[in-house]
UniProtKB/Swiss-Prot annotation:
Name listed for the protein in its UniProt record: Light-independent protochlorophyllide reductase iron-sulfur ATP-binding protein
SUPFAM superfamilies, per database record: P-loop containing nucleoside triphosphate hydrolases
Obligatory cofactor(s): [4Fe-4S] cluster
Recorded GO CC terms: chloroplast
Main location: plastid
Function: Component of the dark-operative protochlorophyllide reductase (DPOR) that uses Mg-ATP and reduced ferredoxin to reduce ring D of protochlorophyllide (Pchlide) to form chlorophyllide a (Chlide). This reaction is light-independent. The L component serves as a unique electron donor to the NB-component of the complex, and binds Mg-ATP.
Signal peptide range: none
Organism from which the protein derives: Chara vulgaris
Gene Ontology MF, one: oxidoreductase activity, acting on the CH-CH group of donors, iron-sulfur protein as acceptor
Amino acid sequence: MKIAVYGKGGIGKSTTSCNISIALARRGKKVLQIGCDPKHDSTFTLTGFLIPTIIDTLQSKDYHYEDVWPEDVIYKGYGEVNCVEAGGPPAGAGCGGYVVGETVKLLKELNAFYEYDVILFDVLGDVVCGGFAAPLNYADYCIIITDNGFDALFAANRIAASVREKARTHPLRLAGLVGNRTSKRDLIDKYVEACPMPVLEVLPLIEDIRVSRVKGKTLFEMAETDSSLEYVCDYYLNIADQILSQPEGIVPKEIPDRELFTLLSDFYLNININSNNLEKNESSFLII
């Protein structure tokens, strides 16, 4: 099974991906996480350091694939999750999609691409050009990370459009949304009401999720010394269980941009109007 994780930049894709990878491993699966971001920090909380990238390794070998060994590019992370960082071209040059293609090509050359139960692609930001949509060419499922905000849901809608486009020629389905670190889910619910898709999980606003990234540890590793965090791990285990059940998934039908803008902005405006009316009523009551 191959999974591509997308979402707005800074939404917490890598943190979520690492914890999902651990959860899948806890369910007895052999897991490989591939970071598809020039920052090459996707697997940081699994390995505790920035591992060398595929592109760096290939460059050091003058792109002689026969000189590259699995241990040159595949690193063992926490929980027996294997880790690879694709890397990227120099800033302002080249195509990230090409890098993803080279990564998959090399893993196939090493007979490593098909030996895992689950391969998870963690893809940078909300860039949905043909290049960074490349992991969708290999994926069975796409998971979109979002929060309860306007920008994240707007990005999710654009990613849903990419899934629909790729599903024309590939056996790809959207597994669903994962809400990350959000105190509310009303806007998420409003969106999925207008654009039907599964919501796999909504994680509450837990500060330790953010702290884990800074510490370079997954929530599962932190929970080993702090049992109060075990309930957070259950969220990721729930996501893993849903994925392993091989859900039917959907081919989403995204909302046109202007229609979505109106839907989400009207929702915000109505909330503000209701809040103002409530404040006025309370003020009137106090005056009386």
